[in-house]
Amino acid sequence: MNRLILQFTAQLHIDQYAENSVQNHRLDLQQFQAWLERDGQLATLDDLKALARQDILDYQGQLAQRLKQRSVNRHLSSLRLFFRFLQTNGLIEASPLDGLVFPKIIPGLPTLLLPAEVAALVEAPQDSHYLGLRDRAMLELLYSTGMKLHELIRLDAEDLQLDTALVRIRGRRERLVPLTDKAVAVLRRYLTEARPGRLLHPEDPCLFPGRGGTRISRMGVWKLVKKYAQAAGIQKNFNPRTMRHAFAIHLILGGMDLSGIKLLFGYKQLEATALYSHVNAPDFRAAYFAYHPIAAKRSPSA
């Protein structure tokens, strides 16, 4: 089974899955493999062919004893993707997950950053230093575009189209996204004042090098974002998607509809934006504009 997992993860790389997603799928499958091999026998392709729906339900029950439902569903999604890979390559005829319905999860509301908090966060880096200017450019990009961390670190310098204020976000959801004037100005400074001479290899196309001169890591960016959130005095529950949620919610409160968010995020289905459907509810808007010290100057219907 080890060989099959390696082949599967190689295919995910070919399909341009984010490295973080590839590693999560790999770890999920290794846990499933350990469960299959709990009697000490190595799991083989024949063992996978012999699996039935009840085996998957038994494994699901074992996961549910120690994990939240969201994590259980992620494990099952990894299995579904793996067995689909085996089917596509003619290694099995049917998947034991065919027709299996995952329990629905009611999404919680994302942490809401106020515009003033975002401004404080973005302005926290000391851009008189090259690292601070790089960090300011990354934060401006995250808020200007709503891109994910893994999309940010995969950017190359050539993905910026500053003359037309656009950035090309590559990957499975490749798209062109507009940039704010503020982001364009900071990125121009970064490209001329900070990036030159900071690459370990001058021909490296990466937009944001880390301290070692090679492409900065996802964890490296996340640590920086948390550091600047703390420096900005933000005490809220902060996670890698908080800036993305702020981008979406502020646009919706400004009047953009969910179909616009769908295009900016590269979603294929409008249902993927359901997390933000509450934002235009009258009660939510009224509370937001009533209690937000800056937005309170505007009308809830503005």
Predicted regions and their residues:
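Conserved catalytic core of the tyrosine transesterase superfamily
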Residues: 1-302
